[in-house]
Amino acid sequence: NHFGNSTYIFTPLYIANYCENYCVYCGFNCYNDIHRKQLSMEEIEHEMKVIADSGIEEILMLTGESKSKSSITYIGDACRLAKKYFRNVGLEIYPCNTKDYAYLHECGADYVTVFQETYNADKYETLHLMGHKRVFPYRFEAQERALMGGMRGVGFSALLGLSDFRKDALATALHVYYLQRKYPHAEMSLSC
């Protein structure tokens, strides 16, 4: 209904890169001494206008996983701006509860992508040493909460190579299959 036999090009836009997690493999983790930035609404709108002027009709807004630096209100305000410029607005942010996903959808978000990182719960625990991301089940259930909050679509992925890539690829497919059966109206996508 929304996409048909079409292909859309999207571009990512990091609106903030603060993180409160300690993931041993990630360059953005809270212990890495890198330049951190949270764009103002004026900066976000400027970037969106430049991107939209290039002809791109879909944007994926990303934040680091910091609820204190990238509040739901901040992300919602960015979604409202994005809807002025883009047909489709996606988010790749920290996992949220259903109420927050519903709010973001009301603000203009169409879909959410969540990287599970690995579906191997034991390996997951050894890679995520601190922060909200450490809670495996909460991350695993994020896509379903997004759909319950009204999102039109959800994206899935594992970071292949953190654990056995074959098992993670299969687990990702099974995760999609399960939610596709439960929410047949929803759009599902996979990232590599």
Each predicted region: which residue ranges?
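Short Fe-S-cluster ligation motifs
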Residues: H46-S66
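Radical SAM/AdoMet-radical enzyme domain recognition
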Residues: C23, E57-I59, I72-L159
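Conserved C-terminal portion of the radical SAM core fold
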Residues: E58, T63, P137-C192
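Short amphipathic alpha-helices and their capping/turn segments at secondary-structure boundaries
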Residues: M48-K49, N97-G108, L170-P184
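Glycine-rich anion/phosphate-binding loops
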Residues: D33-H46, V135-Y138, A171
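Glycine-rich, proline-tolerant flexible connector loops at the mouths of alpha/beta enzymes
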Residues: F10-L13, L60-I72
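An N-cap/entry alpha-helix motif that binds or orients negatively charged groups
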Residues: N1-Y8
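Canonical Radical SAM [4Fe-4S] cluster-binding loop centered on the CxxxCxxC motif
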Residues: Y8-E43
